[in-house]
């Protein structure tokens, strides 16, 4: 029988283990309960969360039971990991609104029927803790000296770390202990930026409960240059269609760099790895076919098959000259002009009367390339922008132009 760990490793999910051999044996011999925490600092999940949910879904498909832990309690404190300044504190009402919204989204990705998965909120136990009891029962197991060496604290010490935030590691560690006692949860999964907090939880369960506990981190979603994916210049790529439309969501994946196609197919779809490798090996114009598969599959998972088809058809109509696009004015440029600022190209081809007018258009949010809003006046026209030999420019609500290479 195949071990789900092998599939997770093959797809590139796993970055670090606390106990690799123990984890392998446990997943081979038992159907375990594991958890991933989600921070409710917004009323929607974004693509950074989606990779964690795919991690959960692969584990669930292999027969293991996930707990999706929403941090309604820890959000009252704020996670200092990866932050250079203290987070803005949310009200209880804001947090509860976000928790309710995220719960609805999660139920689309993870099967919670018949006890196959559990939704939990750490506010249920953290908000009613007695502080003195907590210090005696949990604080005694943590070394301040060791905590100060954790990466999540080190980068904050120079600018100032509040005692409020310093408690976050204890609270997250206690989450693991609580879930271990209540659901026999033996494993935590999470992003690699949570490594220090996850180690704290594993050690607390092992010391306080004398039980099996381990953790593994999943790869953060980065592109070939090491930059976080799922972020646009305008902000996060949300899973909520009211925040990021299914079409814009589709177009984001349709426009990823060639070098990132195979990685995204492996991490963000359920396509078999043989097919992932075949698509990832395509070159030249053929890689556009792989990008269409990537965009369709991810949009289908997040927004459903109907919305994925609509997004695909809309994109095809725009680039194939569908009913509304059949008479789109087309300009041609020399290949040497690829790599120039889009404002220069548009001005030289008379798509815009002047670069000043183009800057105004961008600043007002009225210019898009291939369905994606241009956020900065220094946007460069790249080779990746050419889909099926053309770039579609939209000005305002109804004005379109195509740019093709001579």
Curated annotation (Swiss-Prot):
S4 RNA-binding domain: residues covered: 340-404
EC number, as in UniProt: 6.1.1.1
GO molecular function: ATP binding; RNA binding; tyrosine-tRNA ligase activity
Positions of L-tyrosine binding: 35, 168, 172
Residue ranges annotated as motif 'KMSKS' region: 228-232
GO cellular component, one term: cytosol
GO biological process per UniProt: tyrosyl-tRNA aminoacylation
Predominant location: cytoplasm
Binding site for ATP: 231
UniProt-annotated location(s): Cytoplasm
CDD domains: S4 (cd00165), TyrRS_core (cd00805)
Superkingdom per UniProt: Bacteria
Keyword Aminoacyl-tRNA synthetase part of the UniProt annotation: yes
Catalytic activity: tRNA(Tyr) + L-tyrosine + ATP = L-tyrosyl-tRNA(Tyr) + AMP + diphosphate + H(+)
Residue numbers covered by motif 'HIGH' region: 40-49
Keywords: Aminoacyl-tRNA synthetase, ATP-binding, Cytoplasm, Ligase, Nucleotide-binding, Protein biosynthesis, RNA-binding
Family: Belongs to the class-I aminoacyl-tRNA synthetase family. TyrS type 1 subfamily.
Function description: Catalyzes the attachment of tyrosine to tRNA(Tyr) in a two-step reaction: tyrosine is first activated by ATP to form Tyr-AMP and then transferred to the acceptor end of tRNA(Tyr).
Subunit structure: Homodimer.
Protein name: Tyrosine--tRNA ligase
Organism: Clostridium beijerinckii (strain ATCC 51743 / NCIMB 8052)
